[in-house]
Structures are given as structure tokens and as C-alpha cells.
Amino acid sequence: MEKRILTDVERIERNERIARAYYAAYDKKAVKDGATYADWVYASHATYWSPYFGNGMIDLETNPISVEDSATMEALSYSIEFKDWGPIDFECYPSVNGVAWKTHFGAHRKSDDVFMDFFAYSYVHTNEYGEITHWETHVNSDYNDFLDVAIGEHGPYRESADDYMRAVMTKSPTTGSAGGLISALPG
């Protein structure tokens, strides 16, 4: 199928759907609300980067990261220590060239009902076809305290995101793929 250059309006709408699909994955409304990940299409040589998770570029063409799979693995792991983990608030800002969003996550600890929260920020750049060319994620410092409770350790994971995903998968009651994140970073 031949690619078609999208109009500015189509690009903005698609970029908003990209952000809302991310939110739906974490809010577990994907099926109920009819959200899909069809708009999460990576361009050739697309990259992912986060200073917290490895601080290196991941080639998304050869190591695609599934938002749905990653959200599932984190939710399973985090729910062992937290009874109601998920997004509290979500804001997205679509534009012609991409979308930025802020997600406020939080939960009550099962052990003592203390509420813990953190913020995550994502930036996705897209091309004229609406394909993702670059995606990055940032978290605030409260994420460290949250992870200490949720998985027993925190980053930043400077060498590789593998250590984070191993901790998540070790804590998880199930095993499985983390959507290509493990071993995706050089190191």
C-alpha cells in the first residue's frame, strides 16, 4: 500500500490518537472505549530515548516497543504492592509534527494505604505520513520512591533498560515479553 501525505488536520488528529492510545493502555479502557494502537506506526529508523531508562537510543524499527505490552507488564508488577495503580490525570497537546503528554500516575500502598504518585512526560515526533520518528519519556523524581515500593529498586538505569524490565518481570506474577524493551538498548 502506498503511503499518503496527511493534511495538517489529519496529522493533528492522528497525533492525538497516539497519545490517547497510550493513556488507554494504562487506564485499561482500550477495549471498552474502542481504542486501538493502529496509529502507533514507526517510521523507518524511528528511535526511542529516555534518560531514566538506559539513556541510549533504541531503534524502533528493529526493536519495536509495544505500549500495550509494556503497560500490562508494569500494571501486573505494580499491582502487587499497590491496590489501585493507574493514571490519575492525563493531558495531551497534539500538533502537526507530533504530540506531548503528561500523565499523573498514583496508587495506594496495600500495606498501609499511603498514597504515592509521580509524573511521566512523553514526546512523540511524527513525519508527514503520521509515522512515529522519535519517542521519548521522562519521569519526575517521585518515581524513585514509587519504584522502591513497587519493584524493590529504582533507577535511573543508565547502562541499560534491561535492568528495569528484569525487575518488573521478576516482580510480575506472570512471565512474558515486555514488548521488545529488554535487550533493545546497546550496552
Where are these regions (language model features)?
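C-terminal and inter-domain tail/linker signature
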Residues: 1-187
